[in-house]
UniProtKB/Swiss-Prot annotation:
The gene is rqcH. Key component of the ribosome quality control system (RQC), a ribosome-associated complex that mediates the extraction of incompletely synthesized nascent chains from stalled ribosomes and their subsequent degradation. RqcH recruits Ala-charged tRNA, and with RqcP directs the elongation of stalled nascent chains on 50S ribosomal subunits, leading to non-templated C-terminal alanine extensions (Ala tail). The Ala tail promotes nascent chain degradation. RqcH, RqcP and charged tRNA(Ala) are necessary and sufficient to add an Ala tail to a model stalled nascent peptide; does not add Val. GO terms for biological process: rescue of stalled ribosome. Residues 179-281 are annotated as: HhH domain. GO terms for molecular function: ribosomal large subunit binding; rRNA binding; tRNA binding. Keywords: Coiled coil, Protein biosynthesis, RNA-binding, rRNA-binding, tRNA-binding. GO terms for cellular component: RQC complex. This is Rqc2 homolog RqcH. PANTHER family: NUCLEAR EXPORT MEDIATOR FACTOR NEMF, RIBOSOME QUALITY CONTROL COMPLEX SUBUNIT NEMF. It comes from the Bacteria. Belongs to the NEMF family. The lineage of its organism: Bacteria, Bacillati, Bacillota, Bacilli, Bacillales. Activity of this protein is best tested in a clpP or ssrA deletion mutant; ssrA (tmRNA) encodes the SsrA tag added to nascent proteins in stalled ribosomes by trans-translation, which targets the nascent protein for degradation. It comes from Bacillus subtilis (strain 168). The keyword rRNA-binding applies.
Length: 570
């Protein structure tokens, strides 16, 4: 648990410095659990994310772009009514709990001044965002409702008094003394890190393990000293926001994690840290839920085609015996005089072989020798004719596999909007039936929305995240002399630099983006081809997004999320 009470303390301090006194200019609710405040503060526009997601609950300033629904949810409408246009007077923390309270001064419909408190409770699957009337301490509404039958201690329903979750009888680390530490920790029994969590509020196992590690040989002298030093770092806002990666797993915190033996990366702020840590995680989780049926369908279709190829290859093996059937027919015809009906096999000399060996030819005893010879000629003709057909079927099935591999890759990095476009593509390709509900109007065709990036030198880079976007970008948006990029022989996005002569750094940055949005995302030294759009062609009858190209150059890059985040235009 990295977003513990200590982290909440640090984030509360950071937000007070950055947005206290700021005006809430817009409110959006892009997803069920997430609310975005657009805030004008300290002379610039900022976006504040409030998330009550069961797995990714958090609060921080974000630079990420979020897609808004065409119709705002009811909770979003309520927030707009009560606090849009209001000013954030201050932000405070409830003790050292993972609860942040935003004090917002606004005006109601008739112009009277009102003060609202917005509680953001960061508590895993119990996370919530609750708006209250500050004067009356009455709940106006919450993102999630909590009825008396669900929780006997507190109710979260409009009109009810707001009540904080039950307080834990623990010591505040920010006021703790050496005596407090020695009085509550037993050095003879039990794990010390667990005891620290049990006795001090706002402290997570991550913090406690760090304290024990810094104490070295933890005893009554070293551990209190290490704990008090860490408490002081938090209290005095001496934060070192970082992500430490150990065996591929990432940990984030506001203090250095010396007990983790891995690669650490520092950030300028806690918000920047969280923006990087959660980049794509919550969205991938949402997409996974939305696209479960789609992903299952695509994987099954790929499997069907793979099985089809196996069967066709067996048929091809049989078909390749055509020459043998022809030989049997000719040898039987040459030896009709020595055969009779009822024979089960024929022992004949193979005159076509230099060594003239005797071979055995199976016969149908119910047929005459002449009929047996004709049967082998018929088998020969069928086998010969089927080779071309079977090879064509194998080629088509292989194309289907490549197509579904492309879709699997696209689903792995898709946004909710991308999912809709992939579904539409499968409907148009007659793979799926349309999901149109009764009475629902047919949506008008629309141009896909492309992701936009800006290179260090200021050039625009456009990215297609699915086949519809790829086709739109490559065949309609890009100019003939723009530079087109794609991972070499690997499913991935089409990427276009809006320039005929980009600098080398821009090419490498665009190639990094192309590698990141490809099947080779987790690889190193990924080959990426680039060429001018004029050398990219779509074959007649090809599936959406499929192209051929020539006159390409190849560069090798390592996919890097930090580069993608840095270059993305919000």
């Amino acid at each position: 648990m990295s977003f513990d009470g200590m982290f909440t303390y640090g984030m509360t301090h950071e937000l007070n410095e950055k947005i206290m006194g700021g005006r809430i200019t817009k409110i959006h609710q892009p997803y069920k659990h997430d609310v975005i405040f657009h805030i004008r503060a300290k002379g610039k526009n900022q976006k504040l994310l409030l998330s009550a997601h069961p797995s990714y609950s958090r609060v921080h300033i974000t630079a990420q772009a979020y897609e808004n629904p065409s119709e705002p949810p009811m909770f979003c409408m309520l927030l707009r009514k009560h606090i849009e246009g209001g000013f954030i007077e201050k932000i405070e923390q409830a003790g050292l709990d993972r609860i942040m309270i935003f004090h917002i001064k606004s005006r109601n419909e008739i112009g009277d001044e009102t003060v609202r408190k917005l509680y953001v409770e960061i508590m895993g699957r119990h996370s919530n965002i609750i708006l209250t009337d500050a004067a009356e301490n009455v709940i106006i509404d919450g993102l999630k409702h909590l009825s008396p039958s669900m929780n006997s201690y507190r109710t979260v329903l409009p009109g009810q008094d707001y009540k904080l979750p039950p307080a834990q009888d623990k010591i505040s680390p920010l006021e703790a003394s050496e005596d407090d530490i020695l009085r509550h920790l037993s050095f003879q029994e039990g794990r010390l890190d667990k005891q620290i969590v049990d006795h001090f509020s706002g402290v997570s196992p991550l913090f406690a393990k760090e304290a024990v590690h810094r104490a070295g040989l933890a005893n009554k002298v070293t551990l209190p000293k290490a704990l008090l030093a860490l408490f002081a770092e938090v209290k005095e806002h001496r934060f070192i926001p970082n992500i430490t990666t150990v065996n591929g797993k990432e940990y984030f915190y506001l203090l250095e994690l010396t007990h983790l033996k891995g690669e650490a990366r520092r950030f300028d702020s806690l918000s920047e840290l969280l923006d990087r840590f959660y980049f794509g995680k919550a969205e991938r989780d949402r997409v996974k839920q939305q696209a479960q049926d789609l992903e299952r369908f695509v994987v099954n279709e790929r499997k069907k085609n793979a099985n089809k190829i196996k069967k066709l290859e067996k048929t091809l093996e049989y078909s390749e015996n055509a020459k043998e059937f022809q030989l049997y027919g000719e040898l039987l015809t040459a030896n009709l005089y020595m055969l009779k009906k009822g024979d089960k096999q024929a022992e004949v000399i193979n005159y076509y072989d230099e060594e003239s060996p005797t071979i055995t030819i199976p016969l149908n005893p119910n047929k005459t020798p002449s009929e047996n010879a004709q049967a082998y000629f018929t088998k020969y003709q069928k086998a010969k004719n089927s080779v071309a057909v079977v090879e064509e079927q194998i080629r088509l099935a292989q194309e289907e596999i490549e197509y579904f591999d492309q879709l699997i890759q696209q689903l792995s990095s898709a946004s909710p909007r991308d999912i809709s476009e992939i579904r539409e593509e499968l409907v148009e390709g007659k793979y799926l039936r349309p999901k149109q509900q009764k009475g629902q109007k047919k949506q008008k065709p629309h141009n896909p929305v492309l992701e936009t990036y800006e290179s260090t030198s200021g050039l625009t880079i456009l990215v297609g995240k699915n086949n519809r976007q790829n086709e739109y970008l490559t065949t309609r948006v890009a100019a003939r002399d723009d530079i087109w990029l794609h991972t070499k022989d690997i499913p991935g996005s089409h990427v276009v630099i809006r320039s005929s002569e980009p600098d080398e750094q821009t090419i490498m940055e665009a190639a990094t983006i192309a590698a990141y949005f490809s099947k080779a995302k987790d690889s190193s030294s990924v080959p990426v081809d680039y060429t001018k759009i004029r050398h990219v062609k779509k074959p007649n009858g090809a599936k959406p997004g499929f192209v051929t190209y020539d006159s390409q150059h190849t560069v090798f890059v390592t996919p890097d999320a930090d580069t993608v985040i840095k270059l993305k235009k919000s």
